[in-house]
Amino acid sequence: MKKSLIALTLAALPVAAMADVTLYGTIKAGVETYRTVKHTDGKVTEVKTGSEIADFGSKIGFKGQEDFGNGLKAIWQLEQSASIAGTNSGWGNKQSFIGLKGGFGTVRAGNLNSILKSTGDNVNAWESGKATEDVLQVSKISAPEHRYASVRYDSPEFAGFSGSVQYAPKDNSGANGESYHVGLNYQNSGFFAQYAGLFQRHGEGTKATVGEPVEKLQVHRLVGGYDNDALYASVAVQQQDAKLAAAPNSHNSQTEVAATVAYRFGNVTPRVSYAHGFKGTVAKADGDNRYDQVVVGAEYDFSKRTSALVSAGWLQEGKGAGKTVSTASTVGLRHKF
């Protein structure tokens, strides 16, 4: 009897050691069609059409923790892209880190989402492949969202408020240079508000003119909305500005807004988003970088893990005789594990 108990205990040891390690991921893909019509001086000068089987950003990851007692834990995560279209490779190319979590908050170091990117789910709730992301996702306002080799601190929540700070050293950021990130969040009874700021002394910017590097990049974003079991609504406002490195007193700047509304009816969740980019400054002159975008679609949940996706988008960049109009649509499937 004692031998049986000893054998059973020894057999359970590896299981106990693995108990705090979780395998997770998302597989998502679909069929896409797209069309882009470019105008010059009021005439159609270029038409592009296409269709493809596209991966929507599938991923696989491992995460775990070790409890030291007294509320202190070591936490880690290793996450990577896992395209079913065979377009991604490498380990840790998505959010991956190691850190500590306790009553003081959470400290992590690794390849981390920027604080700006952490607000992204309330700005862009859509799925698509790379070829159509400008049309089927609210991606123009999301362009400054990146991951950085950085260290990040997230505070615990106090009366609905929480904050974050993040630093990416210059040596880990390549040509982008060092960057600083701050964030403030509030939530109460389904209502939420978020602020995220990015400050980068040297970087390519997101509204940069080709061949003209920028510096002193700033991005400020405010997001507010309401989220309960059925109704979701959000509004985002973003301002970004950068100085052209080789041109004194010149700036690339733009203000953008986006709004999304969704409502769940049983297993079906229809959704609509609208985004607008106001006329900004490119180099020293007013730039025609205005745009308008509409995305409509719905999700049907077969279960808690598997959903069917359908969406269509329209994007107009510029105005009048020099505008470019793009449309796209997709039907896809997503499974979470």
From Swiss-Prot:
Superkingdom as given in the UniProt entry: Bacteria
Cross-referenced PROSITE patterns: GRAM_NEG_PORIN
Record's bilayer topology term: Multi-pass membrane protein
Keywords: Cell outer membrane, Ion transport, Membrane, Porin, Signal, Transmembrane, Transmembrane beta strand, Transport
Subcellular location: Cell outer membrane
Subunit structure: Homotrimer.
Protein name stated in the entry: Major outer membrane protein P.IB
Organism: Neisseria lactamica
Classification lineage: Bacteria, Pseudomonadati, Pseudomonadota, Betaproteobacteria, Neisseriales
